[in-house]
Amino acid sequence: SLSHTDPDWQWNEFFSTENDSVVWDSVIMSGASHGATTSARFALHQRVDRVVMFCGPRDQYESWQSLPSATPKERFIVLSHVLDTGWTGDNYCRSWEMLGLNKYGPLVDVDLVSPPFGNSRRLITDADVNHDEKRAHSCVTPGKAAVKDNQGRYVHAAVWRYLFDHPVDQVGQAVEPDTNCRKELR
């Protein structure tokens, strides 16, 4: 088991010795793109600590996002770049509102607002990706496409800490659904 092969990482926190199963309340589900969709769908059926979605979820023709959720919706947090085609095509704003995330704060541009971003669950960035929509899709996660400053530091490091560490009981002020977000995309 992981707790035996790498005990320094304290894997026991995530496993129940009583019934040899995962302690899902301690697990953070996270994914990018299709992984964001998978993480959100999983969390509707199984309560988890929180759900961190990068550049997603994108499921513009379905309505599963509005189903009852085993994981409280204030535990869902999203980040996307505004040049990502999922954003420009209104796919993300539709999914985010169907998840009810507007109840936990307005859209917040992380390039203009400092942590804790008004405690919002809906974060966007307009970081410079040289107008490359493909890079925009992947720049919000750590890796080679992530945006760095002149010293080579990730510009979204504080955002990532917020997504994974911010207390889930601290939420932003509810706002009305965005009238500019197209809900019917067929």
What residue spans do the PLM features occupy?
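Gly/Ser-rich "nucleophile elbow"/oxyanion-hole loop immediately N-terminal to the catalytic nucleophile
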Residues: L2-I28
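Gly/Ala-rich beta-loop-alpha elbow adjacent to hydrolase catalytic centers
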Residues: I28-S39
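The feature captures the conserved acid-bearing segment of alpha/beta-hydrolase catalytic domains
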Residues: D49-K148
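Conserved hydrolase catalytic core segment
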Residues: R41-R50
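Catalytic active-site module of serine/aspartate enzymes centered on a nucleophile-bearing elbow/loop
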Residues: I124-R186
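Extracytoplasmic/secreted proteins, especially bacterial periplasmic and envelope-associated proteins
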Residues: T37-T38, N91-R94, A158
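Surface-exposed acidic, glycine-flexible loop patches that form ligand/cofactor-binding
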Residues: S16-S21, L44, Q65-A70, D169
